[in-house]
Amino acid sequence: MLKDLVLKNRSYRRFYQDKKLSVETLTELIDCARVTPSTVNSQALKFKPVADDETNAHVFECLNWAGLLKDWPGPEEGERPSGYIVVLCDLALGRNKYYDEGIAAQTIMLAAVEQGLGGCILGSINKEKLASYLGIDTEKYSIDLVLALGSPKDEGRLTEDGADGSTAYY
């Protein structure tokens, strides 16, 4: 049932880095998003899968991992994602891209959970640095999200809001 996937889909920030992902696996996840609805069927989103160690390291350097944990630079070596999907928007086609990106990102994450994977949707990105490294033309494409993926080391859990109404993560 879909609700079971939703309940398993948490924001995982630590992974078994030695459990590699292939570009083919990432492409399968992307294909799930490819067939989701898009605003006026513009299909403005493009996806860049990354699964090799060298490129993964460069992508990692461009990400901020947890806004509420100011002193945490992200997962340590050995606990980093084994793959990423960079979500791009074709600026010539993009209208209401934030809706489309949300639909696509959630679809990819649910497909990942179905395969026993986990991930984290990241929007705090050094976009200039990432575009430069990946050779993305920022006149034509915007980098809006990076989906970090792998075999989760964290145990996802649901918690109730704090007594003070706080929703900060634990």
Go through each PLM region and give its residues.
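Acidic, surface-exposed loops and disordered segments
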Residues: 1-170
